[in-house]
From Swiss-Prot:
Originating species: Centruroides exilicauda
Name the record gives this protein: Toxin Cex12
Lineage: Eukaryota, Metazoa, Ecdysozoa, Arthropoda, Chelicerata
Tissue expression summary: Expressed by the venom gland.
Subcellular location as annotated: Secreted
Entry GO terms, CC: extracellular region
Domain notes: Has the structural arrangement of an alpha-helix connected to antiparallel beta-sheets by disulfide bonds (CS-alpha/beta).
Cross-referenced InterPro entries: LCN-type_CS_alpha_beta_dom, Scorpion_toxin-like_sf, Scorpion_toxinL, Scorpion_toxinL/defensin
Amino acid sequence: MNSLLMITTCLILVGTVWANDGYLFDKRKRCTLECIDKTGDKNCDRNCKKEGGSFGKCSYSACWCKGLPGITPISRTPGKTCRK
């Protein structure tokens, strides 16, 4: 029973450590995904979930995501924005 609890705890920690938070970044266009503050939250949430994140919102006119997989390209700052 203790082993099962330890394994579960480790898996939760690994998932937390490997999850990234940041702005969705298009490597090809070299820009972050553009949105309209507040009204763009639904689109950002949809795009973030499509990329494997837990949720997304519009922040500083760019889509910010929480819980993205480690392989998803992100930017820590909004920077130059582009349309999807």
